Amino acid sequence: MTKPENIGIHGIEVYFPSTYVAQEDLEKFDGVSQGKYTLGLGQTNMAFCGDREDIYSLSLNAVNNLMDKFNVDPNSIGRLEVGTETVIDKSKSVKTVLMDLFAKHGNTSIDGIDTINACYGGTSALHNALQWMESSYWDGRNAIVVAGDIAVYEKGPARPTGGAGVVAMLIGPNAPITFESGLRGVHMENVYDFYKPDMDSEYPRVDGKLSISCYFRAIDNCYNRYAKAFEKKYGKSFSLDQVDFALFHSPYNKLVQKSFGRMLYNDFLNNPNDSRYASLEAYKNVKPEDTYFDSVLEKALSAITKNDYATKVAPTTLLAKQLGNTYCGSTYSGLLSLLDEKSNDLVGKRVLTFSYGSGLAASAFSFKVEKPINHIVEKVDLKNRLAKRVRVEPEIFTEKLSLRETRHNLKNYVPSDETTNMFPGSFYLSSVDNAGIRKYDRTYSTSAVLGAFQRRQQISQSTIKSLNLFRATKSVLSILKK
């Protein structure tokens, strides 16, 4: 078999819940100062789920929508891997649930499984897919990588940093968005900055200050190791000057702003005599670990990077601000935000990427956009879908999270949330039996059903219009469910 070239992303899709809470509303509800969440964290809205949605249903929606929008033949997929830390079952993987989308088409020969380490699982799943395609085990088929989570926190200062969403990516050779082979910097260590030892709760245990220290230390190491790989491959020094765009794992947007400054700080340490860094002279001989919480340095870096942040990073932040932290999906929702914002202007551009998962695992790597990607942007239709969401009052948001809390790990029940506000065609949890087996159904509208049927069967709009809508809807539901 011919060695595949230009491996990368052919299609990308995100599924997010149809409900969200505005951070400005949460500020009032929580009785905190105006701007604490919107300015202090840099967040706008936060997606959330009630008891009708879980990581299985979100992932089913992301993969099903990806396959539908990009006309993916289920039998063309040879690897399916999921990165998530939202664990429903200590044994059964999310990937096995997703197999329902393929087995009904006769494809049960699909490699891959779930990958778990906090927010890093999606990146590990992605790298596994790339390495599979580069190996002797590759069978010529494409891969789908799934990355996402439902991020919830108990009442308190961390709750506004939650979120929900799942990204699915179609990976294959000769892609418009390619990975720069051999360019990666990795850092991993054993630390308890964020972890979930209690299987009876969705809530994590978090040492916030330690986690920020770990995040910055990981950036320092990954960035410099990526720089060395770049210099080895291209024979020239690396700095942010070689980067057209930069995207980051985003627990909250303010940390992304600081992280971009952190990369420039490393450029300064690597080239302290550059006149652009004159205001940082006092930090020339200071240990990096002593600067993590230095407010004077932070302000200086913010001033130096202000313009570059606006052009290189801000275009990646839409979904992070609108959905909140999607954990494993965070980095790739940033990529999708960038595609939506810049479209074909990205052709020929390098996108430096930093992915972080507590515990910890992190890496820096890069994409290059080799071909026009406006067709991807049009199919995802991101901003229109965001605009169709339902804004929910903080009181209702709090009730929904309380409901999730009481029903976590519960058996023998039927979820009580309404499905009327869900996006048409969405999978949702319909019941959990006394053995803990979960059942799913789908929401439908006439237009959504007929639209999906038309795409699946490749029949004309005029033919659709000639059908009796009620009869057509009833008849095609059975086809779409097969």
Swiss-Prot record:
The keyword Lipid metabolism applies. GO terms for biological process: acetyl-CoA metabolic process; farnesyl diphosphate biosynthetic process, mevalonate pathway; macropinocytosis; sterol biosynthetic process. InterPro entries: HMG_CoA_synt_C_dom (IPR013746), HMG_CoA_synth_N (IPR013528), HMG_CoA_synthase_euk (IPR010122), Thiolase-like (IPR016039). It comes from the Eukaryota. GO terms for molecular function: hydroxymethylglutaryl-CoA synthase activity. NCBIfam families: HMG-CoA-S_euk (TIGR01833). It catalyses: acetoacetyl-CoA + acetyl-CoA + H2O = (3S)-3-hydroxy-3-methylglutaryl-CoA + CoA + H(+). Keywords: Lipid biosynthesis, Lipid metabolism, Steroid biosynthesis, Steroid metabolism, Sterol biosynthesis, Sterol metabolism, Transferase. Condenses acetyl-CoA with acetoacetyl-CoA to form HMG-CoA, which is the substrate for HMG-CoA reductase. The keyword Cell division does not apply. PANTHER family: 3-HYDROXY-3-METHYLGLUTARYL COENZYME A SYNTHASE (PTHR43323), HYDROXYMETHYLGLUTARYL-COA SYNTHASE A (PTHR43323:SF14). Pfam families: HMG_CoA_synt_C (PF08540), HMG_CoA_synt_N (PF01154). This is Hydroxymethylglutaryl-CoA synthase A.
